Amino acid sequence: MSVITIAELRAGVLAATDLTTRDRRLHTLTAALELDPVPIDTSVANHWAKLRVALRDRGLRMGVNDSWIAATALALDIPVLTQDDGFPTLDELRVLHA
């Protein structure tokens, strides 16, 4: 799991507007924190740079956080597991929707 994912989950807890949502998000964050987060290293940074250029060349957009999560997945050769629709279709990026 990317450190960016941890940050997004934590922000989701902080942004919750009701206790039910907060508790559900906190449960997800707590489970995620049991995993060792993948740091942003040189390999992830290189994949991020290539991804940004590929997106630009194809006229596609991706949020900054999503692009770091995608770069982490590319560096590890694993799919992105998401509930988010922010990942454009790219041959090199495998995306699984939960």
What are these regions (language model features)?
Residues M1-A75, T89-L93:
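PIN-domain endoribonuclease scaffold, especially VapC-family toxins
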Residues T82-G86:
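Short, polar loop motifs at secondary-structure junctions
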Residues A98:
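Conserved acidic donor-binding segment of nucleotide-sugar-dependent glycosyltransferases
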